[in-house]
């Protein structure tokens, strides 16, 4: 499947402070954030004009699920548009607090852990064909996903009883199973709950919940692009060396704690391999696969950055990727800060900087400031992101949903939508079932819109 439907769901951390002290509970902050949403959507679970879903998840975490995308840059753009949607809610909520005489600064963090040790996720979705053994996909994918943090982790300062240490991944410490149907209790690497949001006879949806939330556009593109390419290779019958892990949960932590990528992890059958070895194998197969697939500039960029990042890890010369890979960008920032102020990694100011890197408010968030200075590379533009706040992807089913929502809202009609249904809540209760996520034109939807 060279053209694949993909999406990213991001849960955001939330807090509200007043002169540096916590002002409101996360529950209260979430209610203020979603008050505007509830006023027009009559719910804290809504679909937007750009085809995305916005809702309040378990534990008062705002969650944004992008619409269906079929290219990497399109997905990165719509993922960033989610930040803008949440930032608009933040600004509105702060104004409401001010109007009510409460005051306070609201923070939304695109990260994966809070100071209390709770974790919230960034879930990737990939449409895959129903035919074929799911177990083969998960067997080949697991070693790749366990070691993928080497190229696309968000970076984190981990406070241990002995000392503070810098790790590749925020999410690695919170994963407890390899493949499972749970998402919160056991937090697997791959979630097997079968909800295709498409024709279930043809497709299933691969739900990957191990990844970090990324700030750098290039890292997001690398994270999703490499996974999609590995899936494509599995579907094409590419043979990989067997890197089945003896204990994926121990391995994911060991990889996260080793910035050199060279520490051996134990494979099934007593063999050993390093994260670098494993990633090199997948990358080598990808380079070969490029020669057999249709040319695609975005996929070629992903394979090039993948190789360059592995070279940087192997040589420990990160200047090759220090504007493109989140954990490298963040580590360089910390090192400069430590050198300038002569402080240890365990200093509370570093922990504050770690959090501020993920603050999505423009002009305040540290990553945004780095990006403005040209210290973080880009794959999309502010103009494209702004357009994606209101406009759905034009090449997938998201266009049908977005056009329907826009038309219904402008006509003042009551409606209900989900990923596959578009329904007018009138006497006739007319409903269109859109089972093909690749289809952006549908006469039934056009007739439904025309009838308004």
UniProtKB/Swiss-Prot annotation:
Q: Which GO terms describe its biological process?
A: modification-dependent protein catabolic process; proteasomal protein catabolic process; protein pupylation
- Keyword DNA-binding listed? The answer is no
Functional pathway = Protein degradation; proteasomal Pup-dependent pathway; Protein modification; protein pupylation
Active site residues according to the UniProt entry? 57 (proton acceptor)
Top EC category: ligase
In its miscellaneous comment, the UniProt entry states: The reaction mechanism probably proceeds via the activation of Pup by phosphorylation of its C-terminal glutamate, which is then subject to nucleophilic attack by the substrate lysine, resulting in an isopeptide bond and the release of phosphate as a good leaving group.
Which domain of life, per UniProt? Bacteria
Provide the E.C. number(s) assigned to this enzyme.
6.3.1.19
Q: Which family does it belong to?
A: Belongs to the Pup ligase/Pup deamidase family. Pup-conjugating enzyme subfamily.
Q: Which residues bind ATP?
A: 53, 66, 419
A Pfam family reported for this protein in Swiss-Prot or TrEMBL: Pup_ligase
Biological role stated in the UniProt entry:
Catalyzes the covalent attachment of the prokaryotic ubiquitin-like protein modifier Pup to the proteasomal substrate proteins, thereby targeting them for proteasomal degradation. This tagging system is termed pupylation. The ligation reaction involves the side-chain carboxylate of the C-terminal glutamate of Pup and the side-chain amino group of a substrate lysine.
Question: Which PANTHER family does the UniProt record give?
Answer: PUP DEAMIDASE/DEPUPYLASE, PUP--PROTEIN LIGASE
A GO molecular function assigned to this protein is:
ubiquitin-like protein transferase activity
Q: Name it.
A: Pup--protein ligase
Organism (species): Mycobacteroides abscessus (strain ATCC 19977 / DSM 44196 / CCUG 20993 / CIP 104536 / JCM 13569 / NCTC 13031 / TMC 1543 / L948) (Mycobacterium abscessus)
Q: Which reaction does it catalyse?
A: ATP + [prokaryotic ubiquitin-like protein]-L-glutamate + [protein]-L-lysine = ADP + phosphate + N(6)-([prokaryotic ubiquitin-like protein]-gamma-L-glutamyl)-[protein]-L-lysine
Q: Which NCBIfam families match?
A: pupylate_PafA (TIGR03686)
Xref: InterPro entries: Pup_ligase, Pup_ligase/deamidase
């Amino acid at each position: 499947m060279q053209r694949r439907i993909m999406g990213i769901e991001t849960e955001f951390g939330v807090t509200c402070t007043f002169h540096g002290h916590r002002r409101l509970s996360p529950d209260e902050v979430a209610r203020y954030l979603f008050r505007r949403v509830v006023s027009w959507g009559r719910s804290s679970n809504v679909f937007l004009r750009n085809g995305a879903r916005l809702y309040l998840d378990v534990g008062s975490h705002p969650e944004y699920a992008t619409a269906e995308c079929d290219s990497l840059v399109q997905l990165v753009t719509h993922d960033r548009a989610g930040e803008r949607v949440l930032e608009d809610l933040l600004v509105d909520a702060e104004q409401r607090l001010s109007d009510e005489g409460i005051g306070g600064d609201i923070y939304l963090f695109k990260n994966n852990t809070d100071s209390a040790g709770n974790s919230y996720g960034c879930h990737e979705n990939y449409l895959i064909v129903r035919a074929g053994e799911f177990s083969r996909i998960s067997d080949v994918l697991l070693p790749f996903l366990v070691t993928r943090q080497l190229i696309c982790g968000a970076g984190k300062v981990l406070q241990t009883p002995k000392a503070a240490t810098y790790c590749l991944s925020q999410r690695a410490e919170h994963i407890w199973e390899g493949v499972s149907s749970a998402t919160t209790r056991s937090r697997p690497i791959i979630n097997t709950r079968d909800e295709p949001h498409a024709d279930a006879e043809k497709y299933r949806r691969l739900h990957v919940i191990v990844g970090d939330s990324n700030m750098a556009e290039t890292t997001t593109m690398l994270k999703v692009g490499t996974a999609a390419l590995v899936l494509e290779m599995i579907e094409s019958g590419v043979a990989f060396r067997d890197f089945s892990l003896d204990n994926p949960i121990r391995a994911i932590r060991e990889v996260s704690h080793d910035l050199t990528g060279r520490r051996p992890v134990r494979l099934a059958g007593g063999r050993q391999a390093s994260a670098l070895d494993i990633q090199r194998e997948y990358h080598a197969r990808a380079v070969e696969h490029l020669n057999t697939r249709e040319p695609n500039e975005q996929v070629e960029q992903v394979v090039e950055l993948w190789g360059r990042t592995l070279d940087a890890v192997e040589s420990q010369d990160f200047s090759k990727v220090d504007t493109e890979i989140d954990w490298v960008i963040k580590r360089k920032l910390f090192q400069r800060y430590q050198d300038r102020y002569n402080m240890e990694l365990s200093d509370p100011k570093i922990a504050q900087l770690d959090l501020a890197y993920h603050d999505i408010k423009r002009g305040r968030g540290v990553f945004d400031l780095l990006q403005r200075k040209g210290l973080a590379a880009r794959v999309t533009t502010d103009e494209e992101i702004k357009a994606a706040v209101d406009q759905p992807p034009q090449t997938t089913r998201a266009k049908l949903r977005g056009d329907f929502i826009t038309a219904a809202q402008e006509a003042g009609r009551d409606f209900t939508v989900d990923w596959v249904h578009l329904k007018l809540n009138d006497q006739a209760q007319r409903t269109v079932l859109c089972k093909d996520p690749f289809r952006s034109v549908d006469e039934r939807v056009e007739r439904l819109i025309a009838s308004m």
